[in-house]
Design a protein with these regions (language model features):
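Acidic, proline/glycine-rich low-complexity IDRs
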Residues: 183-218
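Long, contiguous N-terminal structural blocks used for assembly/anchoring
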Residues: 2-173
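Intrinsically disordered, low-complexity regions enriched in Ser/Pro/Gly/Gln/His and often acidic
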Residues: 42, 55, 174, 199, ...
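Short amphipathic alpha-helices in soluble, non-transmembrane regions
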Residues: 167-188
Length: 218
């Protein structure tokens, strides 16, 4: 067999289609939209911020046991250090605790106020600088709620030069509640929106029976 015959007998090479080669795209595929519900914004910080700053341990010496719910211990914490109850009342907070809280609380939380009461910052500042003559009462709201916070709703003032005022239950013309409040407000630079809803002379056990004025905002 000749070389010509042998070459002719071989099958022809297949013709490949002319497919252009394209570089891989640099744009990633779209990310599917999340079906999870968006996080609900909190009042003063992410959930658990009160636990992280140690709020509940600071409040423990001042728990208002009579205001606890029936059958509840004054303070029960879960494994994360948060209170089991979402409402933790306290009374008689002293100057050292107030000063500690001023250094720990975030700025936004210090702006909290009980309706028209003074801001938390001015209340804590008054207490911290009064060497026991000003005490605070209020409550903490736990991480279970979106309004997790510390609130002060009342202060107790024992300055000796303020004890001569006369406050009457019926707030008649002779009642000196407005004059008393103005002295307290100006002395301690309190930024309240109105006079306290209640002003009562008391001798609380957490102040050792010392006489003082209890001023409360609804």
């Amino acid at each position: 067999m000749s070389a010509q015959t042998s070459l002719a007998a071989q099958p022809a090479s297949p013709v490949l289609p002319n497919i252009p080669v394209r570089p891989p795209t640099a744009t990633p595929p779209p990310v599917p939209a999340s079906t999870a519900a968006p996080a609900v914004p909190r009042l003063y910080g992410p959930p658990g911020w009160t636990v992280r700053i140690g709020l509940w341990r600071l409040l423990e010496p001042w728990l208002d046991t009579p205001r606890c719910l029936p059958g509840e211990a004054p303070l029960r914490l879960d494994a994360l250090g948060a209170p089991v109850s979402d409402y933790v009342p306290f009374r008689g907070m002293d100057a050292a605790t107030a000063a500690d809280l001023l250094s720990r609380l975030p700025a936004a939380a210090l702006s909290d106020r009980q309706n028209l009461a003074p801001s938390l910052k001015t209340m804590l500042t008054a207490c911290a600088g009064a060497d026991g003559q000003v005490r605070l009462c209020g409550y903490g709201i736990g991480p279970q709620r979106e309004d997790e916070r510390l609130s002060v709703e009342a202060l107790w003032v024992a300055d000796a030069d303020l004890q001569g005022y006369e406050v009457l239950v019926e707030h008649s013309r002779d009642c000196q509640c407005s004059a008393l409040w103005e002295r307290v407000r100006d002395r301690y630079e309190l930024d309240a929106g109105c006079i306290p809803d209640d002003i009562v002379r008391t001798r609380p056990e957490w102040a050792g029976g010392t006489v003082g004025w209890w001023m409360w905002w609804d």
